[in-house]
Each structure stands twice: as structure tokens, then as C-alpha cells.
């Protein structure tokens, strides 16, 4: 029986090695393509949720915009400029405490009194945040994103986000998908920007 020559064995090994390398490269290429497809799908879903959240605020705007305008005009009557009103509303996104702060502004209390009164009124956000936190943890929302979500959270943002959580639960979604950070931010950013902008307009008109 004729034994294979050393050259034939070497060629055979080389062919096998090339085939294995080609298969590995093909598998890597398929994995990369699949990863890109999943990433693109997640990106599209995030934007879809964001715009869904923004659209859900439209009925609420009927009540929020007039209140923001009234707050701005009251601020102007108490000596706040449009820029000052916008800054206050942007950094303290809570209508009740802002009306209280504007009312206290003219009575010339100390700055500490205004801060304490605002903080006490905003304490309800601690309860709202505590109710939302378990769903955010299940969705594995990072700490920076959680802080951002809490910053733009007001009563209406919380209510719409919880409504979305319950809707997804009824639809049979898993616990990790009940809270949508994108939906929450769509609601929060829309309400936040609308609020401080219309308050600034009210201050400019009423000044």
C-alpha cells in the first residue's frame, strides 16, 4: 500500500486549516451582521418609544400650557425676568413649588425659607420615585440614566410612565421591558421644555 508523501500531507493540512479559517471568518461576519441588526432594531425601538411618549403628552398640554403662562406672568409681577423665570422652571420642574416660590419672592423672606418651602412641597417626588424605582431596576436602567429620568419627572410624567408600565404588563411583556426609559424621556423632555418655555413667554408678556 502506498503511503501518502510528506508534501501531500502538508497540502491536505493546509487545505483543512484554510477551510477552518474561512468558516471562522464566516461565523464572525454573521455574528457581526446579526449584532448590527439587533443594535439598529433597538435604536429604532428607542426612538419609537420616545416619540410615543412625546405624543402622549398632547392631551395634558391643554392644562399645562395655560398654567405655565400664568406662572410666568405672576413671576413678572414679582420682579422676575423672562430669563430668570426660564431658569427657575428649568431647574425646579414642579409647578406647585414654583407657584409657592413666586408668591414668597415678593414678601422678601430669606433664601433659606424659599428653598425649604420648595423642598417640602417637592417631597412627594420621593414617593413617586420610590414607586417607579423597582421597574427601573428590573429594566436595568443605569444610575446616570435614572438620575436623568428623575430630573424630568413631574406628576404627569410619573402618571404616564406608570400607565405605560401597566399597559405593557397587560400585554404580557417581561419584567425587564415594563419600564421604557425612552418613553419616559419622551414624556419628560416634552413637558419640561414646554413648561419652562411657556413660563418664560408669560414672564416676557406680563413684564
Task: State each model region's role.
Residues 2-7, 20, 31-92, 103-118:
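Helix-loop-helix hairpins and the membrane-proximal interhelical loops
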Residues 93-99:
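Perimembrane loop-to-helix junctions flanking transmembrane segments
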Residues 72-73, 100, 200, 204:
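Alpha-helical transmembrane segments of multipass membrane proteins
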Residues 115-207:
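Helix-loop-helix junctions within the multi-pass membrane cores of secondary transporters/permeases
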